[in-house]
Amino acid sequence: MTNSQIKQGPASIESAVDEVLAAPGVVDSAIKAEEDGVQAVVIDCMLDPGLDAAREAVSIPVIGCGEAAMRAAGTNFAIVTVLQRQERAFADLARRYGLADRMTEIIGIGVPVLALESDRKTALAATIEGSRRAMERGAKSVVFGCTGMLGFADEVSSALHGLKVIDPLPNAITAAHEAIQNSQTTDKAVYPYPDAKPIVGFRECAALDALMRSQADD
């Protein structure tokens, strides 16, 4: 298993603007991964930036942490995320994945993504409190709304009497391994390669730029 950072984009992803800025780098990284022989890609963000675009660009499975986590959560799940401003984004994702009727609520803990690393103790306490609120209001499971909450699941579950907690990154990695074991590929009838057209301004995303230019040459 390997990991890579996008070469251009925001320091964290908390808004629709952040998603747009991150997507080209996500697609570029997915293309490079396939070229390097990687068998599946996981997008390390709960908002699934560039997910559909990456699936169009490659034939290997591309797993979105958000989609995989919501599907693993079962019924009556809440999303406990960094900021309340993400409520609309997660509601939109749940509808897109056909899971809106399973989601009870979205709770922001008031800790920005970058602060998850700088003050883990405060972030963990806020995550436990947000998860407690969700459980008290009827949630049967909690999905972390940020992969930066990695490692919090056991402590949150223990503090809340065994509440089911989905830690999105390891969950998505498991889904990727299963896709590889089952020899899955991206269905190109559903996610066809992009149509030929000139593009400008993406030279830093060399693999994405090359894909579009090769399609145009075809």
Which ranges hold each PLM region?
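C-terminal functional extensions of proteins
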Residues: 174-175, 183-218
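N-terminal glycine-rich anion-binding loop in soluble enzyme alpha/beta folds
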Residues: 1-24, 82-119, 209-217
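Charge-patterned, long linear interaction tracts outside catalytic cores
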Residues: 123, 132-135, 139-150
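Glycine-rich, highly charged phosphate/nucleotide-binding loops
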Residues: 15-32, 122-129
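A polyampholytic, Gly/Pro-enriched intrinsically disordered region
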Residues: 22-25, 78-92, 126-129, 183-197
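A C-terminal functional module that forms or caps the active site or interfaces directly
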Residues: 140, 147-159, 164-168
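Short, acidic/small-residue loops that bind anionic groups at enzyme active sites
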Residues: 55-75, 158-176
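Periplasmic-binding protein-like
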Residues: 35-45, 139-147
